[in-house]
Every structure is written in C-alpha cells, then in structure tokens.
Amino acid sequence: MTTTKRPIALLILDGWGYRENTHMNAVYHANTPVLDRLNAQYAHGLISGSGLDVGLPDGQMGNSEVGHINLGSGRIVYQELTRISKAIADHEFEQNPALCDAVDAAVKTGGAVHIMGLLSPGGVHSHEEHIEAMCRMAVARGATKVYLHAFLDGRDTPPRSAKSSLSHFDDLFTTLGHGRIASIIGRYFAMDRDNRWDRVSQAYDLITQGKSKFQYDNAVTALEAAYSRDENDEFVSSSAITDANGQVATLQDGDALIFMNFRADRARQITRSFINPEFDGFARAVTPKVNFVTLTEYAADIKAPIAYPSDNLVNTLGEVLQNRGRTQLRISETEKYAHVTFFFNGGKEEPFNGEDRILINSPKVATYDLQPEMSSTELTDKLVAAIESTKYDVIICNYPNGDMVGHTGNFDAAVKACEAVDACIGRVVEALAKVGGECIITADHGNAEQMTDETTGQAHTAHTSELVPFVFVGRDATIDKGGKLSDVAPTILHLMGESIPAEMTGKPLIHVKE
C-alpha cells in the first residue's frame, strides 16, 4: 500500500536577494503578484547567505555551491576559499604533498609546471592569491618553466576587470625571475558545465598545443585586442602568448598541470578532457601524459591527486531523511542540478536511499538573457506532478533564473526571469495546497537585485552579499530573526516533527503557533 505524503517543499530561488536600493533592482521591478501575496499572507523574513554566516571570509559574497552545502548540511561549513587562504597564511600550502610531488616530478625531468585556473579576485571558483602562491611555490622548488593559463572572469567580477590581474602576474613573474602567462581565454569556454564541448575543446587545444584564434606577445595586449573585438573578460577568444622567441607553450609528457579552481561544478568538464582515457566529448589531437593535480575534489569519478580533499559531512538533511525512512526528491535544470544533488548532499555523488532525482535540460542558448524563462515551465510541470503524486516527504527544487540571467548583466531579461519564476511559484503553491503540503521559499545568495555597479556604471554580473528571502507557506507561524542558510535543514526537520542530529548546529527558524 502506498502511503500518501504531505510534502514539505524547499524552493531555492537562485540569485534572488533583497536590496533596499531599487535602482536597477530586477527583483524589485519585476511584477511578482504571487510572491507579493505570499509575503502579505504568510510568515516571512530575511536570512543571510554570505560571509562568515556560510563559512566564507567576512563580507565575501555567497555563491551557489557554498549556499547549497550550508542549506543541506544544517551547519556552517568552512569553505575551501577560507581553508586554502589559511593554509597559505600559515605556510602549510607550500608543503602540500600533492602539489609538491607534481612540481618535483616535473623539475626532476626538466619538464614544465603548467598552472591553470580562473585568474580572478572573485573568490567564487578560485582566488588569484592562491594562483600566486602556487607560482611562487613552483619557482621556489626549482621550476624554471612555469606557464600560467589564465581563464578570465567578468562574471563574478566586473565584465572588463582582468587587466589589473594580468599586469600583476606579469610583474610577479619578472620578480620571480621565471615563468610567464602562456595563454588567456574566457571562462565561457574553459569552464562550461553544460556539455558544450565545442567550447571546452578550444581551451584544451590552447593549453595542450598553443592552438588559438589569436596570438600575441603580451597578455595585456591580448586582452586589449579582445576588448577592441567587443569581447568582455568572460568571452575572450583563445589567445596564445608567445615568449621572446615567438614560441608558444605546449603541454608535454612529464609536465605538471595544476588546476587551481576550488569549486567543482565548472572544473569537472575540462578536467575530464585531460585525464579520462575514454573521454569522448571531442576529438583530442594530443593526449600528453602529465602529472595532473586538482586543488579540491571535483567528483568521485575524477581520479587525480587532490591537494585539499573534502571534509566528510555526516548527517546532512538527505542522510537524516534516508536513515529515518523518509522519501525525498531533488529537481532542477542542468545549470543547478549538481547543486541540489552533489552539493546539497555535502559533496556526495550517489543518491541516498529514498532519494529520487529529476534533471530538466537547460535551454541551449549562448547566454540566458536570450531565454530568461529558461526551462522553468517544464521544471514546474514535473515538480507539480511530483507533489500531486504524494510520494515524497521532502522536495528540494532550484529555480536557476535569477542567477543565470543575472550573470548576463541584462536588466530587462533579469526582470523577465523573476517574473517567470513568480508565475511558477504560483503553480507550485497551488499544487501543495491540494495535498496539504507546505513550502519554504528562500535563496542561496543574491544577484538579480543588483544589475548595475553603482561605482563604475558597468553592468553588475556578480553575486551580492545581500540577505535573501525566507517565506513559510504553511501553518500559522512566527519566524526568528537573524537566521542563515544553515538553519534551513534543521527547520525542515523541526516542521516534520523529527529530531535534529547533533552535527546540525543550525537552529529551527519557524515556530508553528498552536
């Protein structure tokens, strides 16, 4: 006999923050009658998704990976950015066994040390201070051929802001006496996560063969040429940088290749192209045998030395639900599927017992401002069907629109994205009401509420440190102030009448009135 469930749904509106300033605030200017009604009718508040509250440095904007780890684990999780920066400050980084072994092996055979990653102060996928520490460490250990393959940001940073980073690293290599920037390319190509292998192949060919659309003798010159082609940092075409003799750097057998991104989701595809013998995403002209090291763990099936393996998180929400015989569903589009599964489960790839997953393909468009509704209608169709099936105790759903369209910097499109999500929420709430379910609406971090940089006047494409909404569509209740993302999992267990495990240090925010 099938037991009928009265589900609790957690709707994560990605990139949807609250900002007092209404100028170029897509969340404010969007027509959102559903959320307006829910805020008027139900208990609601604001919670924190950034800085120390999510295990990041004070003031650091939140991001989707960090947000979902905190949401799912029910505790503040010390993030890789903080962890690695601390290791550098404590001089532990320069003794890291995985990094030292790769550098030493290359030095011993006269090989090169190639360092690749997002050259950015953004702190979301990487930090340029970590890349600098790696360059310094390689030279200190005797490497004379150090090649930096710089992926440019413009998404978690202003759209045209890479010049200062490139200039700094040119100066750094001059000071060190060895090394140089060997290539630049936008993250749009090197860090795709949606199986657009034609993009990744351009980064692969650039790093392995020095094969590129453009060639320059200086990285800043290459960047300025890209700007003259109207390419912002994120979209800079593959550009090889030649040495004094006009030669490009290539990846050879025995070289070290160290990937300095600490966030997994946009690091996986290009990593697999380098290390997977059965890789078939695109035809590889060369497959050099290199000592490949990842800064953190990108996926269980990526077999490479890891400089900083993940902490093992036990008793996350998913695991607690499994252990108590509860059923759960995770559902999102491609762009945020890893977040409601891998990251929400504390870095575990395999589903828990009783955990179903539904993946909706994100639309195949160059940038999501071209289709701001993304696949939200199809996602909601599946979500409503799952609610009405009464199979699940807990449903975790992410709507990517606010974040993915917010990143384009297109204000009008971001407004449309918010309006599309609002309409979907209306359908979800209606379906939950039919089966006696309840729902929490929140976000992982801000983005769409600030679409222009008030200082520079450029489009603001990055996340924010704003508070995010927290709405309880259910029984009459009060909501505590001062909450944070790590309070959400304990809140869900509390609403279910379940005890909260000791590992969850977050506190229930919702108190139902008797």
Curated annotation (Swiss-Prot):
Cofactor note: Binds 2 manganese ions per subunit.
UniProtKB keywords: Glycolysis, Isomerase, Manganese, Metal-binding
Disulfide bonds: none
Reactions the enzyme catalyzes: (2R)-2-phosphoglycerate = (2R)-3-phosphoglycerate
Entry EC number(s): 5.4.2.12
Essential cofactor(s): Mn(2+)
One Pfam family in the UniProt entry: Metalloenzyme
Biological processes per GO annotation: carbohydrate metabolic process; glucose catabolic process; glycolytic process
SUPFAM superfamilies noted in UniProt: 2,3-Bisphosphoglycerate-independent phosphoglycerate mutase, substrate-binding domain, Alkaline phosphatase-like
NCBIfam families found in the cross-reference section: pgm_bpd_ind, PRK05434.1-5
Subunit structure: Monomer.
Protein name as catalogued: 2,3-bisphosphoglycerate-independent phosphoglycerate mutase
Protein species of origin: Shewanella oneidensis (strain ATCC 700550 / JCM 31522 / CIP 106686 / LMG 19005 / NCIMB 14063 / MR-1)
Gene coding for it: gpmI
